[in-house]
Amino acid sequence: MKTVILCGGYGTRIRDVADNIPKPMIQIGSLPILWHIMKYYSCYGHKDFVLCLGYKSEVIKEFFINYKQRVSDFTISLEGREKPTYHEKFAEADWLVTLAETGLNAMTGARVRKIKKYLGDDDTFMLTYGDGVGNIDIEALIAYHKSHGKVLTLTGVQPPGRFGELSVGQGGKIDGFNEKPQSSGGYINGGFFVCSRRLFDYLDDREDLVLERDPMERLVRDGELMMFQHDGFWQPMDTYREYQLLNDLYAKKMAPWVKW
């Protein structure tokens, strides 16, 4: 099963640390938040990734092209006649990463539509945002998705408090969206989706197609959108304060998403 990650955002609300790089390349410790997300999935055995690139895509491409040199000890002849000799196998050597150009200004729905050709024959794929981490139980998430047979499962999380909430009915079926946060302690869309291939029936050809609007609203009307409840840690990196929080947790070895 492939894991699709949305990596095309500008990071306009966190320009202090993302001025010349795409948002998923903002670092936690010495590595991008994108790497942390991928590493988390890999801990559950999911190592086949499709990255939806947009703004500053060359930065992400360069990171993966040069990844082996970045993380390995090696010996190199400065004459340039021979390839470097690497001295150990690095942990991520079995990752398969497809880097897909999905447009500079394409919105989330358009980006997902454009990577359909890279999913092969898989009927199910995972999808998440390239700017948020959590300690979601990926195995339980997939099992829940398979149990109900609907088109899309999103992970419902309890947020810091500046997001629109989900209206959730019986059995986890999503009935609608509340744009303004309430004081009820409700759940929001935290990403970490599991998707049936039937999702593409809800994606039209518009570049400005926002997955979280028309397609998800249609899924709600059709009774095809379900929520996997997650009451553990979840945190996006949308502001400089959140950048500091995630780096502080990581530096103190208190990061809940670190399973490695």
Name every feature range the model reports, one short phrase each:
Residues C43, K117, R218-R221:
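Solvent-exposed polar/charged
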Residues M25, E165-V168, M216, M227:
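A structural signal for short hydrophobic beta-strand segments in well-ordered beta-sheet cores
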Residues M1-Y67, L99:
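N-terminal glycine-rich phosphate-binding loop and ensuing alpha1 helix
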Residues D123-M126, V133, I138-K146, Q158-G161, ...:
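Catalytic-core segments of class I nucleotidyltransferases/pyrophosphorylases
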Residues I60-Q170:
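Conserved beta-loop-beta/alpha segment of the NTase-like Rossmann-fold superfamily
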Residues I33-H36, R111-K114, P215:
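Well-ordered alpha-helical segments embedded in enzymatic catalytic cores
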